[in-house]
């Protein structure tokens, strides 16, 4: 008997909603990445996108443990000389809380074309409103 590999056409994509109100960033990001990859399903195959869509709400209410709010730094570079920009977690949470969640989850996904496809299924919003009510997302408890 040979091992069965999931086919992209056979995979049913579900929608999940995650409320990050009071949740720890890293613990929530690992669970979100697991669902995006499809590791929660019995038909998981590493070479096939078996993951589901994840809608994250209340991104601005996520917590970080210890003194990471002031000590954890995020860097980006514009490509121009002197173009290095840096911000700590508190500044990121104040200006772009969606990017803080996205960066944490993206680092936990594969660094290839399949990982980019998985990352596109992540939808992050500040506040509790989102435009995906028509998909009837299921509650994902973290």
From Swiss-Prot:
GO BP, one annotated term: translation
GO molecular function, one term: structural constituent of ribosome
Pfam families for the chain: Ribosomal_L13
Keywords of the record: Ribonucleoprotein, Ribosomal protein
Keyword Nucleotide-binding assigned: no
Record GO cellular component, one term: cytosolic large ribosomal subunit
SUPFAM superfamilies xref list: Ribosomal protein L13 (SSF52161)
Biological function: This protein is one of the early assembly proteins of the 50S ribosomal subunit, although it is not seen to bind rRNA by itself. It is important during the early stages of 50S assembly.
Subunit and interaction comment: Part of the 50S ribosomal subunit.
Family to which this protein belongs: Belongs to the universal ribosomal protein uL13 family.
Record's protein name: Large ribosomal subunit protein uL13
Organism annotation: Syntrophotalea carbinolica (strain DSM 2380 / NBRC 103641 / GraBd1) (Pelobacter carbinolicus)
Organism classification: Bacteria, Pseudomonadati, Thermodesulfobacteriota, Desulfuromonadia, Desulfuromonadales
